[in-house]
């Protein structure tokens, strides 16, 4: 009951512009994860980057269950199973980047598409966290039941062999 589990893995590509560049990123993300891609939109206008509000500028995929486990194993292998302690937040979640999509098995470089990087975010939880999200009789999670940084590091080390610097 106390061991953390992987709730979800979010894979995000921030392209910074709409058009063919974003479509290429969506195709790459769809091929890597095998799941449908969702577009991300700009929250505000940034004239310095010529980005308008509500313009599509990125894409993401949320993986859960067995797909999340398999993708996480592959992604951690790409970063050589080493993470930095600063990549963990206070809730035990971890985020890391992958510089090139060509590092994934089965992906090759295409000069027409280019090279894309991506961010991977792993959300950890303990069984029983639903009590704070349910509509009826919602309760706060006690501090002892929350996932801490040390719990997350121990879980990733034990389950995936990750070394934290």
From Swiss-Prot:
The organism encoding this protein is Methanosarcina acetivorans (strain ATCC 35395 / DSM 2834 / JCM 12185 / C2A)
| Similarity-based family | Belongs to the universal ribosomal protein uL5 family.
Instruction: Tell me if DNA-binding is a UniProt keyword of this record.
Output: no
Q: What does this protein do?
A: This is one of the proteins that bind and probably mediate the attachment of the 5S RNA into the large ribosomal subunit, where it forms part of the central protuberance. In the 70S ribosome it contacts protein S13 of the 30S subunit (bridge B1b), connecting the 2 subunits; this bridge is implicated in subunit movement. May contact the P site tRNA; the 5S rRNA and some of its associated proteins might help stabilize positioning of ribosome-bound tRNAs.
| SUPFAM superfamilies for the chain | RL5-like
User: Oligomeric state and partners?
Assistant: Part of the 50S ribosomal subunit; contacts the 5S rRNA and probably tRNA. Forms a bridge to the 30S subunit in the 70S ribosome.
GO cellular component terms, alphabetically, are: cytosolic large ribosomal subunit
Q: Which NCBIfam families match?
A: PRK04219.1
Gene Ontology BP annotations = translation
Q: Tell me one Pfam family matched here.
A: Ribosomal_L5
What GO terms are given for molecular function?
RNA binding; rRNA binding; structural constituent of ribosome; tRNA binding
Protein name as annotated: Large ribosomal subunit protein uL5
Q: Domain of life of the organism in this record? A: Archaea
Tagged with keyword rRNA-binding: yes
Q: Which PROSITE patterns match?
A: RIBOSOMAL_L5
